[in-house]
Design a protein with these regions (language model features):
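A compositional/biophysical signature of low hydrophobicity enriched in polar/charged and small residues
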Residues: 1-337
Length: 337
C-alpha cells in the first residue's frame, strides 16, 4: 500500500527518540498519529524496503561493550572496487566509504572485543595486501542522537558525551544487546518476539531496555534512518590537528554545533596528525561546506591544520554489530529456559 509522504516523515522523524517501550508500541504510535496500527507497520515496512529506515533499535554508548575501530587504506585507483568489495564482505564492517584523499577507503570494523577487531583487521590486510590505519576512539563528544529530517540538522540540544561511567554489558545481557543492534521485528508485539528468542518474559525485555536507557548504556532507542536515501546524499568527514591538552575543550564545543552529526577524538597515525573528527551531512556539497566553515569558526578551530574528506561512494552502511557473535547464545538461553 502507498503511504502518504507526511505520514512517512512523521514515522521516521518523530520516533528517533522516545519510542514507546510498551507491549504494543506501534499501536501507541498509531494513536498519536490518529491512524491505524496497520498503517504504521506498513509505513515502517515500506521505509525498510526503500532503504530510508535502517532499523528500529538502539545506539549503544562507547562504554557498553564490544569494540570498534576506524580503519583507513590508501588503495590504488585501479584496485578500489576490488578492495572495497573485500572490505564490505567482512561481517564486522558496518560502514565502508570511498573518500576524496590519498587514503581513500574508510571503514569501521566492529567486534565483541578489541582482540577480535584486531584479528579481523589483520585478515583484511592479508587479503588485500595493503596496510590499514587503526584510528581508535579516545573520546566520543557526540554519537548518534538522531537527525531532524525537517530541518536537516542533528536532533535535540546537544548533550556532551563524557567517558562512559557504566560497566560494560556482560553474560546474559549480550543476546538482547545483539537483538537491539539488529532491530525490532515489524509485528504488533515486537518485544514478545524478542522474548521468545531469549527465553525471557516480554515485561523483562521492555524493562531491561528502559534500564539501559536510564543508566546510559543505550544512548537512544528508536528509529535509525539512512541519510542518503532521504536526500542527504552529501557528507564530509572533517579532521583537525589539535594539541592534546586542548582537544577536549574544542571537541565539546564542536559537538554542540547544529549540523554536526558525529564528533570524536581519535588516535593519530604515522603521517596522519589529526585527532579531532566531525561528520556533517547535507543535501549538497555547498550546504556541507557552509556548515563546516561555521562550526570550525564557532569551535575556535580556525588556523588549526584540517582536511575535509567528502565521500564519493558508499559501499556499505549497516548498523553497528558489536554484539553479533552472541546470537548463538539466544538458542541456548531459550532452551535452558
Amino acid at each position: 500500500m502507498d503511504i502518504h509522504p507526511h505520514l512517512k516523515l512523521r514515522l521516521l522523524n518523530d520516533w528517533q527518540h522516545d519510542f514507546p517501550l510498551k507491549a504494543q508500541p506501534f499501536a501507541s504510535i498509531a494513536v498519536a498519529l490518529r491512524v491505524c496500527e496497520e498503517d504504521v507497520l506498513a509505513g515502517y515496512a515500506g521505509a525498510l524496503a526503500d532503504g530510508s529506515l535502517s532499523r528500529i533499535g538502539g545506539v549503544f554508548s562507547h562504554g557498553a561493550g564490544g569494540a570498534a575501530v576506524l580503519g583507513a587504506m590508501a588503495v590504488p585507483d585501479h584496485r578500489l572496487e576490488e578492495v572495497a568489495a573485500i572490505v564490505s564482505a567482512c561481517p564486522g564492517v558496518n560502514h565502508n566509504y570511498a573518500r576524496e584523499h590519498r587514503v581513500n577507503l574508510w571503514f569501521v570494523m566492529t567486534g565483541p572485543d578489541r582482540q577480535q577487531v584486531e584479528a579481523s583487521m589483520q585478515q583484511l590486510e592479508q587479503r588485500t595486501g595493503l596496510p590499514a590505519w587503526r584510528l581508535h576512539m579516545v573520546r566520543p563528544y557526540r554519537i548518534d542522537l538522531g537527525f531532524d529530517l525537517r530541518h536537516a540538522v542533528s536532533r535535540r540540544p546537544m548533550r556532551v558525551s563524557h567517558p562512559a561511567a557504566t560497566e560494560p554489558l556482560q553474560g546474559q545481557d549480550l543476546p538482547l544487546a545483539s537483538l537491539i543492534e539488529e532491530g525490532l521485528p515489524l509485528v504488533p508485539r515486537p518485544f514478545a518476539a524478542w522474548s521468545r528468542r531469549l527465553g525471557m518474559t516480554e515485561t523483562d525485555v521492555i524493562r531491561t531496555v528502559g534500564d539501559w536507557l536510564r543508566n546510559g548504556r543505550l544512548k537512544r532507542f528508536g528509529v535509525v534512518v539512512r541519510h542518503h536515501e532521504l536526500g542527504f546524499d552529501a557528507n564530509a568527514m572533517t579532521v583537525y590537528d589539535v594539541p592534546d591538552d586542548r582537544v577536549d575543550a574544542h571537541g565539546q564545543i564542536l559537538a554542540a554545533q547544529p549540523g554536526v552529526t558525529l564528533a570524536y577524538r581519535r588516535t593519530r597515525a604515522p603521517g596522519w596528525p589529526f585527532n579531532l573528527y566531525a561528520m556533517v551531512h547535507g543535501t549538497n556539497r555547498d550546504a556541507v561546506r557552509s556548515v563546516i566553515e561555521r562550526v570550525t569558526d564557532a569551535a575556535g578551530l580556525v588556523g588549526h591544520d584540517r582536511q575535509v574528506l567528502f565521500s564519493t561512494t558508499r559501499y556499505k552502511q549497516t548498523g553497528g554489530r558489536r554484539f553479533r557473535d552472541h546470537h548463538a547464545q539466544e538458542v541456548s538461553h531459550a532452551v535452558a529456559g
